[in-house]
Each structure stands twice: as structure tokens, then as C-alpha cells.
């Protein structure tokens, strides 16, 4: 038996993007929904500063997922959202970054719609754009790159096309942004090199992008794996590949004469 709200209607689920980490980057609409939510189900990468915006009277439930550590299975999360929508008018599913950029928002929306629940998507700033920006790496620049590809380094076994076509990406995009790719670089980089990218191709890893603890590791295809080991550089991190990675260093070099050699 399905229990409905007192007016006989189901509540509404809002898939809200929390942004990449800096609480100032959540949208006005997203913040307003958090302040008025009756229930919030949030992911692991949502910061405590964002969670502090939630209505103190709301149910607050952790559904976070990390590599190797799943608080709830995906099916359990969507079932939970459906149950919450039966008793609350405003339910927020709070996801890091943007719900529809490697955030499983599409899968959750599909399940909720099938259950007869109204869903609204509130986009967020994705880490693949924000982290490079905070690291002063422009993904496109007239002198460096006129194309960018966003790709996951962590494939789903059930996808209709089982493997990323790294050769096509290497040949078709001047900037490559990889989500969840730190632990897969040892297999990804050889495929990109087979497609024509050289060992001197610039690569940057940005950890905890937009947060105070943000870290950046810059190298080349030839050096980056050893650098990761030496620095013990851990996920989560965004990987940026292409000439744009060299932009900050080149800019400092150009400005040195103006600034008297000050970096």
C-alpha cells in the first residue's frame, strides 16, 4: 500500500547539483531548495559547508558513494527517494557537481519517473570545468585549444557500448578532461599514445578542486605515473590533458618582465 501526502499527491524530487566543492558555487535555486527541503539525500562529495545550508528541520540522509565504499546501492537510493516523496512535498537529491555529468542523475530520474514521481533537475557547476578554472587552466583558448572532451575513466560494465574509444578522443579533441581517472591512467595513457599523443603531452591532476585543500600535480605522459607514486597523489581528482595545461606557466613567463620577475 502506497502512503500519499495528505492532499493525495506525491511529493516532488529535485535533483540538485551541489557544485564542485566551494559552497559559493552552488546556484541560487539550489540553495533555496536546500533551505526549504523537507528531506535531503546527499552524496559523499558534498561538502559540510553545503550541508549547513539545509533546513535544520529536514531529514538528512547520507547516500554517498566512493570508490570501493558504497553507503547505499543505487537501487536502494532511488527506492528511498520514492519513499520520501510519499510523505514529503519537497525532497532534494543532492549530488556533487552536476547531476547529469557522471552523477547517475539520469538513472535516478528514470527510476523515479517510472514510479510516477515528478522530478526536476537543477544543474550544478561540474568539477571538470570548475577545478581547471581554479587551477588557472582554461579548457579552451584561441592559442591552445578549440575543442574539449569530457570522459569517465571508470566505465560501467552494463553500458551499451562497453569501452571508451580513446583513439577517437585522442584524434578528435585538443583538451581531454577525465573524471574518476587517477587509478586508470596506467591503462589510459598507453591507448592515447597509440593514437598519436606523444610522451611529452602535458597532463595535470587536480585534487579537491575549488576547495581550500586543492592540490595540483603537473607533468607529462612520460612522468606523471611516477609523480603520482612519489607524491602519493590520491583520488578524487580531475585529469586534464592537452596544451592548455601549460597555460599557467606560460602566462607567468609572459608576465615576468612586467612584474619584475615576481612569480
From Swiss-Prot:
It comes from the Bacteria. SUPFAM superfamilies: Tetrapyrrole methylase. It is an enzyme of class 2 (transferase). Pathway: Cofactor biosynthesis; adenosylcobalamin biosynthesis; precorrin-2 from uroporphyrinogen III: step 1/1; Porphyrin-containing compound metabolism; siroheme biosynthesis; precorrin-2 from uroporphyrinogen III: step 1/1. Keywords: Cobalamin biosynthesis, Methyltransferase, Porphyrin biosynthesis, S-adenosyl-L-methionine, Transferase. GO terms for biological process: cobalamin biosynthetic process; methylation; siroheme biosynthetic process. Its EC number is 2.1.1.107. GO terms for molecular function: uroporphyrin-III C-methyltransferase activity. It catalyses: uroporphyrinogen III + 2 S-adenosyl-L-methionine = precorrin-2 + 2 S-adenosyl-L-homocysteine + H(+). S-adenosyl-L-homocysteine binds at residues 20, 96-98, 126-127, 180, 237. It is a step in the biosynthesis of both cobalamin (vitamin B12) and siroheme. Belongs to the precorrin methyltransferase family. This is Uroporphyrinogen-III C-methyltransferase.
Amino acid at each position: 500500500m502506497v502512503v500519499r501526502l495528505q492532499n493525495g499527491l506525491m511529493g516532488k524530487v529535485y535533483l540538485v547539483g551541489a557544485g564542485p566543492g566551494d559552497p559559493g558555487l552552488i546556484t541560487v535555486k539550489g540553495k533555496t531548495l536546500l533551505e526549504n527541503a523537507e528531506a535531503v539525500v546527499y552524496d559523499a562529495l558534498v561538502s559540510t559547508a553545503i550541508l549547513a545550508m539545509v533546513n535544520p528541520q529536514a531529514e538528512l540522509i547520507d547516500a554517498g558513494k566512493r570508490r570501493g565504499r558504497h553507503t547505499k546501492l543505487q537501487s536502494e537510493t532511488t527506492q528511498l527517494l520514492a519513499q520520501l516523496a510519499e510523505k514529503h512535498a519537497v525532497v532534494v537529491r543532492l549530488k556533487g557537481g552536476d547531476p547529469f555529468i557522471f552523477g547517475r542523475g539520469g538513472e535516478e530520474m528514470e527510476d523515479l519517473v517510472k514510479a510516477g514521481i515528478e522530478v526536476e533537475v537543477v544543474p550544478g557547476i561540474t568539477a571538470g570545468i570548475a577545478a581547471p578554472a581554479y587551477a588557472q587552466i582554461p579548457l579552451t583558448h584561441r592559442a591552445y585549444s578549440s575543442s574539449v572532451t569530457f570522459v569517465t575513466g571508470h566505465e560501467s560494465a552494463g553500458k551499451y557500448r562497453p569501452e571508451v574509444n580513446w583513439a577517437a578522443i585522442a584524434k578528435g579533441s585538443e583538451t581531454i578532461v577525465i573524471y574518476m581517472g587517477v587509478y586508470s591512467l596506467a591503462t589510459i595513457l598507453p591507448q592515447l599514445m597509440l593514437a598519436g599523443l606523444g610522451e611529452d603531452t602535458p597532463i595535470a591532476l587536480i585534487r579537491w578542486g575549488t576547495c581550500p585543500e586543492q592540490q595540483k600535480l603537473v607533468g607529462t605522459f612520460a612522468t606523471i605515473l611516477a609523480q603520482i607514486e612519489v607524491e602519493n597523489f590520491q583520488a578524487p581528482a580531475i585529469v586534464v590533458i592537452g596544451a592548455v595545461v601549460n597555460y599557467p606557466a606560460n602566462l607567468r613567463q609572459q608576465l615576468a618582465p612586467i612584474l619584475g620577475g615576481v612569480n
